[in-house]
Amino acid sequence: MASGQERIVVGPTGAFALTTPDPDVETAARRVGRAAGEVRGYLVAALSWAPFVDALVVVEGDGGRVETVGVVPSRLLTRMITDGPQVLGHELVDRIVAEIDQHAGRA
């Protein structure tokens, strides 16, 4: 992935690339946006279809957006990635996680 500071979370509500605002929100947003694109790219190549990978910068302050990247207060992160429509079945979540693990092993 872009720098190794990003984390990928996959579950029934989707796939998310997360990072902290290091060294600042704007730089982190660009970095996690690239990471989300990379993950989606190799998922599409491996699975012929892939979910959108939401890029998020997790902050202690207020949320918002930097270009296409969400800026999410840490206190709301759990709710954001667990609430909402279940868009991925368990089998697909397992396949996505396996592909991410395999790709991470090659990096």
Ranges and model annotations:
Residues M1-S3, P12-T13, T20-A107:
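Surface-exposed interaction regions that form or flank ligand-binding interfaces
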Residues R7-V9:
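Short beta-strand scaffold segments in enzyme catalytic cores
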